[in-house]
Amino acid sequence: MIIIHTVYCVLGRTGSGKSTVTKEAAKQLNMSVLRSYSTRQYLRQGETKENSDHILISPDEVEKYRNDMIAYTDRVGYCNFATKQQLLDNDFYIINPTGYYELKLKTKDMDIELVTIMVNVPFSELRKRAKKR
């Protein structure tokens, strides 16, 4: 199989700095970060619809993307997903481990290489960061 596209999948716990690290790397390397779809209806402190890591949609809109979904995660009260086209159009994808597993399964016959980057932060630091959110 000839690889036609490489996607750097960034994984880590909430608050580990995945978005910060990924956005800076993408900026320095002139690469793009995939903004996955999310039915999460709240914005975090300092977040707007424009600067969010996600494209915020209503639960009613999910079905129209169903045939093109490549990584779907059902969270507590909302879901996140990306489409095949988004994957092909971007270089980095910030994704949780459950979504990454599905992504691996659904891309095994595609000419895409997935490179995993884990962002690890001590639990004590995660706790501090969570209190600031």
Regions found by a protein language model. Name each.
Residues 1-5:
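Phosphate-binding P-loop
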Residues 27-35:
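Post-Walker A helix-loop "phosphate-sensing" segment adjacent to the P-loop in P-loop NTPases
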